[in-house]
Amino acid sequence: MNMKNLYLAILYLLAASTLPFAIASDPSPLQDFCIGVNTPANALFVNGKFCKDPKLVTADDFYFSGLDKARTTESSPVGSNVTTVNVNQIPGLNTLGISLVRIDYGINGQNPPHTHPRATEILLVQEGTLFVGFFSSFPENRLFNKTLNKGDVFVFPEGLIHFQVNIGKQPAVAFASLSSQNPGVIIIGNTLFGSKPPIDPNVLAKAFQLDPKVIIQLQKKFG
């Protein structure tokens, strides 16, 4: 093989090796849906935020204060209170793919079964004892659970239903980081039984193998 052909072969191999990196998937959406429009009048950036002029950016755009303060859980029907720190609280998080929450749990309080459609979550227990877990997808439906104490860490994979329960004798506190500036949250009970407009009770009755009257009562409770 002469030098010219060798040179072309090397270029071909380099191009082939970089091809998988060039064929990348679309970025994950940061909102529930994005309807295509032909004019910008009713358009919205996919990440949900317009960018501030870099010359006007200040340190306060990257700052939030108050996560050291406990939140009351007494008024919560599930005995917990979630303080969210995402792009709506810290504008500087826009496009950075990360956010944070503080979760306060009363005695016997819980963060009920829910899912984050756009984020993996890593949770750190600061105070107390939590029983936590997540479920794998159908058909296995495996429950992965663990009892966590102060300093313990647990990961909830993106999109999977998970929960935390305070099983200690004192209030508990945890901090969690999520891999999205706007991870979203779907609380299973609230979504199914508190949807607007409400779903036909017969649909849920068949799905859960319950009397429709039970579903109607649940819809009244969550609605």
Curated annotation (Swiss-Prot):
InterPro entries: Cupin_1 (IPR006045), Germin (IPR001929), Germin_Mn-BS (IPR019780), RmlC-like_jellyroll (IPR014710), RmlC_Cupin_sf (IPR011051). It holds the Pfam family Cupin_1. It is found in: Secreted, Extracellular space, Apoplast. Its main location: secreted. GO terms for cellular component: apoplast. SUPFAM superfamilies: RmlC-like cupins. Disulfide bonds join 34-51. Mn(2+) binds at residues 114, 116, 121, 162. It comes from the Eukaryota. Residues 65-216 form the Cupin type-1 domain. Keywords: Apoplast, Disulfide bond, Glycoprotein, Manganese, Metal-binding, Secreted, Signal. Glycans are attached at residues 81, 145. The keyword Metal-binding applies. Residues 1-24 form the signal peptide. GO terms for molecular function: manganese ion binding. May play a role in plant defense. Probably has no oxalate oxidase activity even if the active site is conserved. PANTHER family: GERMIN-LIKE PROTEIN SUBFAMILY 3 MEMBER 3 (PTHR31238). Oligomer (believed to be a pentamer but probably hexamer). Belongs to the germin family. This is Putative germin-like protein subfamily 1 member 12. It comes from Arabidopsis thaliana. The lineage of its organism: Eukaryota, Viridiplantae, Streptophyta, Embryophyta, Tracheophyta.
